[in-house]
Curated annotation (Swiss-Prot):
Residues 124-152 are annotated as: Important for interaction with fusion/F protein. This is Hemagglutinin-neuraminidase. The C-terminus (head domain) is involved in binding the cellular receptor. It is found in: Virion membrane; Host cell membrane. It is an enzyme of class 3 (hydrolase). The gene is HN. It comes from Newcastle disease virus (strain Chi/85). The keyword Hydrolase applies. CDD domains: HN. Belongs to the paramyxoviruses hemagglutinin-neuraminidase family. It comes from the Viruses.
Length: 571
């Protein structure tokens, strides 16, 4: 609706501007015609009565005076034209931005009052500070000319840490998931009390908050609602998404190890939950026996979901039941993606054979590990109208953790490099009638992940692997035609080990100068990144939520790393 209103306003402004210029042109032409007639008449009169050179000299005097009048009139009209241009080109856009800020502030105030009255809690729907209006979920840098790698991250900035950390040596916080809408952000992670390798019991921390600007102009994330789901349910692999009703979350309910789950014949239980703006959490079990009837194991992709067309879209992956309709539909399908300027030397037939085998790794008993996308209607009823899309393996690699993102009008699926292909992948995604279609991906050759041989960071040939680590890229730089040019992200810059986290801006081939968390021996794991802009200052920032090793309190500490995106004009 906002987009339609903006389009109407712009069309009206363009129509008014055209009418104004047309009127100015007509007045100028009319004045010139009148002056021409006056000059002609004066010349005729003088020529008829002229008898001496002095009489003829008077004609030039009249003409000169007339020219002065015309020049004076045109100058006054030029002032009008200049004022019109200033109004249309400079002042009107600023006035519109101020009006938008006023409207958003009014909506914020009304939402607090209306929601507070409705739930008797005094709590309403939160909204980011006005400084961020137009700077969230947008194409932040539109540039056809500059080298992508001339943009680079600043040093990490000190800001309010909104993520709880372990409080004992045996505590474990892992698997962060983050999503941010134009009104609020959502964050979740898993909490294990007895070490990160315990699969039997865990808590799930879920929070809702907004972006604020301090009195000194610093960015900070303000948590407004949070809950620790500490019950008998063992929620795992959760993905979160910011929706108009709060924070929607999709989790699997796990009672066994991943390997045991793939050996089973029934799908994994899943739950759709929501933390509302009133701080209350509700959830509903999905009917996986119908929705995932062809699956033996199914998990959310860990990365954030996205709200698109009144539905929330989550990444999903898992194992297909052998010879089921979904499994049969993928039989013989494969795709081979190649490294930039680094061709695999293996024979083509061998590459194809290895690519096909990569979808059925031995670790999971030869089950086909499949990518999928689950969409659920967002309404006051949870788990409403779920629809599962299984993309063809002629587009996607072996199923893996992932994230669904929306930037501007474009949608993407990030797929973790769990298989042989190391560079980060972003599949363009289109949605229609509750289902999604994926297209050939953008690849970022220098944005790699560590992995075990033969699928290490520098690998270039198809192989069967379960490796890698989740490190998603965020679309940052676009062409004017809305195609993607560059991304921001935090990668683990090592061949095989989960070491050396660095943040950078990446194009399809190379990367910018990097910002390092610490030394190259620093242990790390998952990272998820999101970028936004403070419109008031026109500064772009990126947040990388990263699992960093923590030797004293727990194995990992989840740290929100904040950078400003700078530009080196010398590049």
């Amino acid at each position: 609706m906002d987009r339609a209103v903006n389009r109407v306003v712009l069309e009206n402004e363009e129509r008014e501007a055209k009418n104004t210029w047309r009127l100015v042109f007509r007045i100028a032409v009319l004045l010139l015609m009148v002056m021409t007639l006056a000059i002609s008449a004066a010349a005729l009169v003088y020529s008829m009565g002229a008898s001496t050179p002095r009489d003829l000299a008077g004609i030039s005097t009249v003409i000169s005076k007339t020219e002065d009048k015309v020049t004076s009139l045109l100058s006054s009209k030029q002032d009008v034209i200049d004022r019109i241009y200033k109004q249309v080109a400079l002042e009107s856009p600023l006035a519109l931005l101020n009006t938008e800020s006023i409207i958003m502030n009014a909506i914020t105030s009304l939402s607090y009052q209306i929601n507070g009255a409705a739930n008797n809690s005094g709590c309403g729907e939160p909204v980011h500070d006005p400084d961020y209006i137009g700077g969230i979920g947008k194409e932040l840098i539109v540039d056809d000319i500059s080298d992508v790698t001339s943009f680079y991250p600043s040093a990490y900035q000190e800001h309010l840490n909104f993520i709880p950390a372990p409080t004992t040596g045996s505590g474990c916080t892992r698997i962060p998931s983050f999503d941010m809408s134009t009104t609020h952000y959502c964050y979740t992670h898993n909490v294990i009390l007895s070490g990160c390798r315990d699969h039997s019991h865990s808590h799930q921390y879920l929070a809702l908050g907004v972006l604020r600007t301090s009195a000194t102009g610093r960015v900070f994330f303000s948590t407004l609602r949070s809950i620790n789901l500490d019950d008998t349910q063992n929620r795992k692999s959760c993905s979160v998404s910011a929706t108009p009703l709060g924070c929607d979350m999709l989790c699997s309910k796990v009672t066994e190890t991943e390997e045991e789950d793939y050996k089973s014949v029934t799908p994994t239980s899943m739950v759709h939950g929501r933390l509302g703006f009133d701080g209350q959490y509700h959830e509903k079990d999905l009917d996986t026996t119908v929705l995932f009837k062809d699956w033996v194991a199914n998990y959310p992709g860990v990365g954030g979901g996205s709200f698109i067309d009144d539905r929330v879209w989550f990444p999903v992956y898992g194992g297909l039941k052998p010879n089921s309709p979904s499994d049969t539909a993928q039989e013989g399908k494969y795709v081979i993606y190649k490294r930039y300027n680094n061709t695999c030397p293996d024979e083509q037939d061998y590459q194809i054979r290895m690519a096909k085998s990569s979808y059925k790794p031995g670790r999971f008993g030869g089950k086909r590990v499949q990518q999928a996308i689950l969409s659920i209607k967002v309404s006051t009823s949870l788990g409403e109208d779920p629809v599962l899309t299984i993309p063809p393996n002629t587009i996607t690699l072996m199923g893996a953790e992932g994230r669904v993102l929306t930037v501007g009008t474009s949608h993407f699926l990030y797929q973790r490099g769990s298989s042989y292909f190391s560079p980060a992948l972003l599949y363009p995604m289109t949605v229609n009638n509750k289902t999604a279609t994926l297209h050939s991906p953008y690849t970022f050759n220098a944005f790699t992940r560590p992995g075990s041989v033969p699928c290490q960071a520098s690998a270039r040939c198809p192989n069967s692997c379960i490796t890698g680590v989740y490190t998603d890229p965020y679309p940052l730089i676009f062409h004017r035609n809305h195609t993607l040019r560059g991304v921001f992200g935090t990668m683990l810059d090592d061949e095989q080990a989960r070491l050396n986290p660095v943040s950078a801006v990446f194009d399809n081939i190379s990367r910018s100068r990097v910002t390092r968390v610490s030394s190259s021996s620093t242990k790390a794991a998952y990272t998820t990144s999101t970028c936004f802009k403070v419109v008031k200052t026109n500064k772009a920032y990126c947040l990388s939520i990263a699992e960093i090793s923590n030797t004293l309190f727990g194995e990992f500490r989840i740290v929100p790393l904040l950078v400003e995106i700078l530009k080196d004009d010398r590049v």
